Swiss-Prot record:
Active-site residues, as the UniProt record annotates them: 46
Class of the enzyme per the UniProt entry, highest EC level: lyase
Reactions accelerated catalytically: a (3R)-hydroxyacyl-[ACP] = a (2E)-enoyl-[ACP] + H2O
Record flagged with keyword Lipid biosynthesis: yes
Gene3D superfamilies: Hotdog Thioesterase
Summary of the function given for this chain in its UniProt record: Involved in unsaturated fatty acids biosynthesis. Catalyzes the dehydration of short chain beta-hydroxyacyl-ACPs and long chain saturated and unsaturated beta-hydroxyacyl-ACPs.
Compartments reported by the entry: Cytoplasm
Protein name (Swiss-Prot/TrEMBL): 3-hydroxyacyl-[acyl-carrier-protein] dehydratase FabZ
Alphabetical list of NCBIfam families matching this protein: fabZ, PRK00006.1
Database matches in InterPro entries: FabA_FabZ, FabZ, HotDog_dom_sf
Lineage of producing organism: Bacteria, Thermotogati, Thermotogota, Thermotogae, Petrotogales
Length: 139
């Protein structure tokens, strides 16, 4: 899935669209990526002399990736809402030039609520992991 297809599914836009492409996708799992550039707006303040991608934005990228997994087959007018986070851990810095990989898997589904396990890696090293909750709402 390329960026044009992603933008047809997700409501997010620059500078807050944090997924550049999808590498793998099936009913229960997704693998997507973000090419982290020095031109990202958040690097202006986080931190100018030592740029690091904020952990909360890594988790937001996971949530957006979850939205792609959950909305890939719908033609309804719905949006994914990030409703919760558990067990978040940040293990390695994400820096300009990194290719950040998001791997997400559905753990539970109840009505329009989903719990997913997310792992973010750079060069196969875990940068962050979390369990996230996403709700699907008609817009």
């Amino acid at each position: 899935m390329n960026i044009e297809e992603i933008m047809k599914i997700l409501p997010h836009r620059y500078p807050f669209l944090l997924v550049d492409g999808v590498l793998e996708l099936n009913e229960e799992k997704i693998k997507a990526f973000k090419n982290v550039s020095i031109n990202e707006s958040f690097f202006q303040g986080h931190f100018p002399n030592y740029p690091i991608m904020p952990g909360v934005l890594i988790v937001e990228g996971m949530a957006q990736t979850a939205g792609l997994l959950l909305l890939k087959d719908t033609d309804e007018n719905v949006i994914p809402l990030f409703t919760g986070i558990d067990k978040a851990r940040f293990k390695k810095e994400v820096r300009p030039g990194d290719k950040l990989i998001y791997d997400l898997e559905i753990l539970q589904k109840k009505a329009n609520m989903f719990k997913l396990k997310g792992i973010a890696t750079v060069e196969e090293q875990v940068c962050a992991q979390a369990e996230i909750m996403v709700g699907i709402k008609k817009s």
